[in-house]
């Protein structure tokens, strides 16, 4: 109780909505899961309008029926807003890792359930969270820095060598739901400028600063497109399914025309695996 009260006091001090604290969960049956649920209930007792949060690793989200039962007990709190997060153990080059289809489908089922009564935000989601938007989330977390677009535990560590580093440059390809290296984007531009503009979603960002705003605009457009299908989950899934189909076809063309520049692993990470997550979720819900 005292911990939740301190958190709420600090949030009130900066005029932020009350967001209940939580723990990173590995299993719905672990002691931490019971503690997290107790904190959620305490927070609701203090402020019935408090937002709630749910953070889990892949093992948590992949726990099937046990996950669904746990989420059902949380949905009963009827929080106005739920913020959910896929916690990664390791992040490589900030490329989405949706290899564990079961885990991401579990997150989507959770969003589906919570969205029946609450608004749902997927934190640290970016383009990898589009299947969760189809499942009912209306907002995804992102940022101007690539490290803000996925939950990387190392991002919260103190850097023992804060020397000057020159990061690689990237360009968001909105039509591909992807972020590719700038030299790849330039190769696509040289191959076919009109095709490049279409899949990029606009002119080539001349600088990394412009690219940051371009990225957020492309992501916002994708989320709005899915939200535009309305609350019906089947319609939202159909909207994203069509988007992934177009991206896959464009990737096939690029891989054929620009071999060794646009590669199969790019398509797999940004199009194929997210599409598999969408279909796994849709199948589980009869969509």
Model-derived regions: residue spans:
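Alpha-helix-loop-beta-strand connector modules within alpha/beta enzyme cores
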Residues: 35-51, 102-120
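Glycine/Thr-rich beta-alpha phosphate-binding loop at enzyme active sites
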Residues: 67-108, 135, 149-164
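Acidic carboxylate-rich catalytic motifs and surrounding loops in phosphoryl-/glycosyl-chemistry enzymes
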Residues: 85-90, 122-128
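C-terminal structured domains
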Residues: 142, 147-221
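Flexible loop/turn segments at secondary-structure boundaries
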Residues: 26-28, 60-61, 90-93, 128-131, ...
């Amino acid at each position: 109780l005292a911990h939740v009260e301190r958190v709420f006091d600090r949030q009130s001090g900066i005029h932020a909505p009350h967001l209940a604290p939580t723990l990173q969960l590995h299993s719905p049956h672990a002691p931490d899961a019971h503690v997290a649920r107790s904190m959620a209930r305490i927070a609701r007792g203090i402020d019935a309008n408090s937002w709630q949060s749910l953070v889990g690793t892949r093992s948590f989200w992949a726990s099937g029926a046990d996950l669904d039962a746990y989420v059902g007990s949380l949905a009963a709190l009827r929080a106005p807003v739920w913020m959910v997060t896929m916690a990664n153990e390791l992040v490589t080059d900030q490329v989405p890792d949706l290899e564990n289809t079961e885990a991401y489908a579990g997150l989507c089922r959770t969003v589906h359930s919570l969205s029946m009564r609450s608004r749902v935000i997927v934190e640290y989601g970016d383009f990898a969270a589009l299947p969760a938007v189809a499942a009912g989330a209306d907002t995804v977390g992102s940022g101007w820095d690539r490290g803000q677009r996925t939950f990387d535990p190392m991002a919260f560590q103190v850097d023992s060598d804060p020397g000057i580093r020159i990061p690689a440059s990237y360009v968001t390809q909105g039509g591909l739901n992807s972020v590719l290296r700038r030299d790849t984007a330039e190769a696509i531009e040289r191959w076919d400028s009109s095709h490049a503009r279409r899949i990029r979603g606009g002119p080539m960002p001349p600088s990394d600063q412009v690219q940051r705003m371009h990225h957020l605009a492309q992501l916002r457009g994708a989320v709005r497109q899915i939200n535009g299908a309305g609350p019906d989950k089947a319609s939202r899934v159909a909207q994203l399914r069509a988007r992934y189909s177009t991206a896959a076809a464009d990737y096939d063309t690029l891989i054929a025309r620009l071999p060794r520049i646009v590669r199969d692993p790019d398509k797999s990470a940004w199009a194929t695996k997210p599409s598999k997550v969408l279909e796994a979720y849709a199948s589980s819900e009869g969509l």
